[in-house]
């Protein structure tokens, strides 16, 4: 997608949900996982486990003494998702500034389209104890591959002495996360929410509960996501169960609830990205939804009636995480770049372009009152983005309030393939009609 397309969308000529939003690409990669019945064949995990033995080949890798021996090589290879960094005329202003100030060249690769296929791509190199070609990779916490990389010892523990900006500016949602206690292996890149949305023209008294998805008053007008991980998680929330600490017996209870929802005729369909269009068209009144789609839809006066709920049971938050794969050739350069993105000045530029949940709360003030190199960068981006800086700074979907932060929930972290199989065997049949 070009920057011009982005600008046209802002002007109202193109549906704003089509341009880069908070969560749009998140769905495509989740769908790739879901359609595959959990995303990973058992052989991928088992082969990896046999090759690695779930331990580092060199136990000293990632220790303070190991890090002290590492040197800057003035190059870093960074693998990320497409359309996920500030871009102007084909270049990233933040990456250019990093190179200018540190003399570290960044080779930036947009090679990750979904977690599963990318994991399958780098797994053979890791199993063979070889460099993957990347010093930084970005993986999502609610998909199995990140857990596999951690469990198999295929990520280098971070050098916390080089996390100055992170320690000072990282927000509470990304510090000490459930999927990586102490941020041993990861630093968040960006985050997003999965929640419930409704059309306020048809739904007059929505309340503040995910139970709206199970209200018979809206039978045939309710949309659910066709991602088994999202579907199962909202079922658990509806039962008052914390997804992150849930058990297989509780998964079964959630599946029964969701099957009843379907059998009772409440569900119009199980949607991929198309759910947002059905909300806009008015044939679906209530739906599971990604925060970014609603944010983008609200940019058009035509869709101001679409509302994202903040349910009392909580919002599911996914996070894309920067991490350093084992055998990386430029780990110190990688650490330098990762911490650079935790400067509020830098993050304000990224966030103005991305509009995701920002990992650095201080970037809000830098958007409202730029004080550094970001002033020129933001000014350069503004004609392409077509929105005031305050549109990003004042959005609770980018800079959540304390209430939203308290209601944020994390996904269950699968420990092995058997757990993935157990989950998908319960929730995929609901989606697929079995």
Task: Kindly give the residue locations of the regions a language model identified.
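Ligand-binding pocket segment of bilobal, Venus flytrap-like solute-binding proteins
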Residues: 146, 221-227, 231-235, 243-309
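Early extracytoplasmic/lumenal segment of secretory-pathway proteins
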Residues: 56-144
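Conserved C-terminal helix/tail region of periplasmic/extracytoplasmic solute-binding proteins
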Residues: 391-434
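N-terminal secretory signal peptides
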Residues: 1-27
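A structural signal for short loop-to-beta-strand junctions that line the ligand-binding cleft
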Residues: 67, 130-138, 156-195, 221
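A bilobed periplasmic-binding-protein/Venus flytrap-type ligand-binding module shared by bacterial periplasmic
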Residues: 195-202, 236-241, 318-333, 349-352
């Amino acid at each position: 997608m070009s920057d011009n397309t982005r600008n046209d969308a802002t002007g109202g000529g193109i549906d704003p949900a089509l341009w880069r939003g908070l969560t749009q690409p998140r769905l495509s990669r989740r769908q790739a996982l879901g359609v595959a019945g959990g995303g990973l064949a058992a052989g991928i995990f088992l082969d990896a486990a046999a090759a690695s033995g779930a331990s580092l080949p060199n136990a000293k890798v990632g220790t303070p003494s190991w890090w002290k021996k590492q040197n800057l090589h003035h190059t870093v290879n960074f693998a990320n998702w497409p359309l996920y960094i500030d871009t102007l005329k084909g270049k990233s202003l933040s990456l250019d500034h990093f190179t200018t100030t540190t003399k570290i060249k960044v080779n930036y690769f947009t090679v990750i389209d979904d977690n599963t296929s990318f994991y399958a791509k780098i797994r053979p190199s890791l199993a063979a104890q070889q460099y993957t070609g990347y010093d930084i990779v970005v993986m999502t916490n609610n998909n199995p591959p990140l857990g596999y990389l951690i469990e198999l010892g295929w990520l280098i523990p971070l050098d916390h002495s080089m996390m100055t900006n992170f320690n000072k500016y990282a927000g509470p949602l990304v510090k000490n996360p459930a999927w990586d206690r102490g941020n041993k292996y990861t630093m968040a890149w960006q985050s997003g929410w999965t929640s419930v949305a409704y059309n306020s023209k048809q739904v007059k008294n929505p309340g503040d509960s995910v139970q709206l998805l199970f209200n018979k008053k809206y039978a045939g007008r309710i949309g659910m996501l066709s991602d088994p991980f999202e579907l199962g998680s909202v079922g658990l929330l509806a039962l008052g169960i914390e997804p992150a600490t849930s058990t297989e017996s509780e998964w079964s209870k959630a599946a029964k609830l969701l099957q009843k929802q379907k059998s009772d005729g409440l569900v119009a369909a199980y949607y991929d990205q198309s759910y947002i269009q059905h909300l806009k068209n008015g044939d679906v009144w209530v739906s599971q939804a990604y925060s970014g789609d609603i944010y983008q839809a609200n940019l058009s006066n035509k869709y101001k009636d679409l509302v994202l709920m903040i349910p009392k049971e909580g919002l599911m938050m996914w996070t894309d995480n920067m991490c350093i794969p084992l055998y990386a050739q430029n780990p110190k350069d990688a650490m330098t770049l990762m911490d650079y993105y935790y400067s509020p000045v830098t993050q304000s530029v990224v966030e103005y372009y991305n509009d995701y949940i920002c990992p650095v709360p201080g970037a809000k003030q830098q958007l409202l009152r730029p004080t550094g190199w970001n002033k020129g960068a933001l000014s350069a981006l503004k004609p392409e983005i077509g929105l005031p800086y305050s549109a990003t700074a004042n959005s609770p979907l980018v800079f959540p309030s304390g209430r939203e932060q308290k209601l944020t929930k994390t996904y269950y972290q699968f420990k092995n393939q058997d757990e993935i199989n157990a989950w998908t065997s319960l929730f995929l049949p609901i989606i697929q009609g079995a």
